[in-house]
């Protein structure tokens, strides 16, 4: 289980997250949703230990080892003009296990190729990444995370800018992973899709306003507070809360 207790983050003297609490069991698929600036990316980065924070974050009761977490950052965060191919990008996700400047062993190559097969990119393993489309790049980043065979997978806006077939491919994959026991935490702006796809939702706006099964989050006032909107906002109608 992932447990986040009383997590607070300050960046540049500004409070970004305040006393966030979250629990995510193995095999659960949770959507992390909230408005722009709500702290979704910061929360994922805090779980990884990439930003200073107060409070506690544990996985299976132990301090988190970020080398064992699968993490898919937003696509623009990766240097796509770097002169490497698809397989090398996926292998870069294993750097924590390989160490710097060490050649990958056969089991590492096998893990990378298996991950590429999971995202239907095996036939492009030798292609330079600068030649990939946006959807292909996103699938490579997912494969990079999956090469670790993680039990905890963090996804930061994985569907941004993707066409519908790619979104469906990745959604099916994330559901399969959760059904196989992987804990999946995904930030997303697609609220309607998150409501339909994710077993659990966490509503975040600098603090957690609710974390519960998506079928139970029907309180209109709660969504209004999360997104700071009026009762007649079309967003609430789209979510079935007219």
Spans of features found by a protein language model:
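Conserved ABC ATPase signature
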Residues: 128-132, 136
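Catalytic Walker B motif of ABC-type/P-loop ATPase nucleotide-binding domains
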Residues: 153-157
